[in-house]
Amino acid sequence: ADLGRVLGLDRAPEVKTIRRKLGELAAHRRGAEVQAALAIAHAHARPDALGFLHIDGHTRVYTGKKDLPKMHVGRLHLATHATSETWVADADGDPILVIGGKPGASLAGELVDAIPDLRSFLGPRRTATVIFDRGGWSPVCFQALIDAGLHVLTYRKAPYDQLPENAFRTITWTGPDGKRYRYRLADQSLDLPLDGGGTLRMRQVTKQTDDGVQIPILTSNTRLAASAVVWRMAGRWRQEGYFKYARTHFALDALDAYTDQPDDPARMVPNPAKKTARNTVARARTHLASANADLADAINDAVTEAGRPGHHGTALVNPKPSQGVSAATDQLADAVAASRATPSHVPLGQVRPGARLLDEETKLLTHAIRMSAYNAETTLARMIAPHYARAEHEGRALLREAFTLPGDIYITDGQLHVNLDPATAPRRNRALNALCKELTATETTYPGTDLTITYTVKDQPDPS
């Protein structure tokens, strides 16, 4: 009932009603349009944060009974049934857009596919630097992003040569966060080979850590300071921070809906028989090596026997090890031939005829709600920061407390008053009071009415 009053209803809808309404919305198949509209709204609200875009894949573990594809889940260090998505965040790590992932797709492929979505909110001419991890390493992907008017920023994938010590110089730099940083950096250019010939000129900024480890970073942005290249690349973990926070406080990995659909039976997937054939070849090689070792032992035994008195320097070699080598050689040849005849990929319908995919429409809608709620919380966290000394570490915790505080709602003189009960500590109460004054100053009206909302917090009770 209390939640219903906040929503302007006599009571909040039941969970089954919410699920039904979400299903009705998902049936329109317009989740991607909702995401695109939110991205455009984010771009209009925070244009200064669009110069750098963090892009990463996110996997959600599935523990149900449906036959979903297996994917590698980095945080668990294993492959399991899961679904994937591609997330786009702004320079501060705040989510802008989520795109449904394709089964088996690499981050490099998803980056190329995401170019039209990026252009939809960036506009046709604005450039941005796209930041991603080594999973997106692909010179072809780099070229596609650059051709689309975007810059690339990522870690270089091994192998690579170590730079000499005299290539580095110490740089002291003040970051956008106002903090001073000291780096040991080397800045150079290199050419990456492209499939089909040709090269791609890239810039490499290598950071040397205090213990001498070299971390090469590649970018096509030649106007960015070397220190800024390193600082921006390190900021990629802001997006990981969002995933962790949203899993805990916004149910990021919740199932949300049970609707599923058949996977594409014609989609080419790795052939399990190929792995079996390769294992057979490996066992045959091991068996042949063992047979050769047995033959060598037999020859050594014969040599020893021939050197004994009365053998006149001759001795017969046991024929069984030689026969074993011949048989093992034939087995290896047969295994290699069988492996070569086994295709590496086959249509999905041949190996998993009952394969399913979770329907992504509901998830796109619920992600839109989560992203909006998180970004609203982020805006409030920025507003409260000047009024709360511990805002960097406790700002969001204070807001979560404020969201659950009881209070009073009443209407007088064309105003909707929201009067919260006191927070758990005077310093928190003072910060919330300052935030309430800023929110009231916006003169926001309650949706569907002409009532102006005013926010206040009750005073702390007198301890005496």
Regions found by a protein language model. Name each.
Residues 9-88:
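Active-site-proximal, Lys/Arg-enriched surface segment
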Residues 73-122, 213-215:
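Electropositive, glycine- and tryptophan-enriched low-complexity nucleic-acid-binding patches
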Residues 1-7:
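DNA-recognition alpha helix
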Residues 1, 14, 18, 49-60, ...:
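Short, conserved catalytic/metal-binding motifs centered on acidic residues
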Residues 105-163:
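Domain-level cores of phosphate- or acyl-group-handling catalytic modules
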Residues 97-100, 143, 148-239, 247, ...:
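An anionic, glycine-rich sequence signature occurring as long contiguous blocks
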Residues 177-186, 265, 272-464:
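A short, flexible helix-boundary coil/loop motif
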Residues 219, 227-233, 254-263, 354-358:
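Short, solvent-exposed helix-loop connector elements
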